[in-house]
Amino acid sequence: MITNPGEINLDDSLRICQETLKKGRAEGFMPLTVTVIDVAGVIRATLSEDGSGLIRAKIAYAKAWTCLAFGVSTNKLRDIFEDQPRLDKAIAGMQTMADGNLVPTPGGLIIQKNGKNIGSIGVTGDRSDQD
């Protein structure tokens, strides 16, 4: 349970990361990296399992950032982009404006409390459809 409805605190962020890693291990996923950020894009927690690749923390952050930037999960965003093939040039432009943080692949979810966005989570390490 989120303890402060206006923000996501460190304890909640760590718990979310730990629970995500626990679920990944139970499902037999490859080593995961999980990042939780607040609505300002500030990293509240990042945890990487042993064997997780060097770039995974950046990817997890970018997935979380992408959710907040567009207000939807990265799964939904991927579907939107796939349905609009002409968006390729726009995506390239947005990637530049986003300092490389635009990652519209599954693994990012918005965290809400009482219908209000308070942060997001990015997960990477396994196949995108399992992140």
Question: How should these model regions be labeled?
Answer:
Residues 1-131:
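Flexible, solvent-exposed loop/hinge segments and secondary-structure transition points
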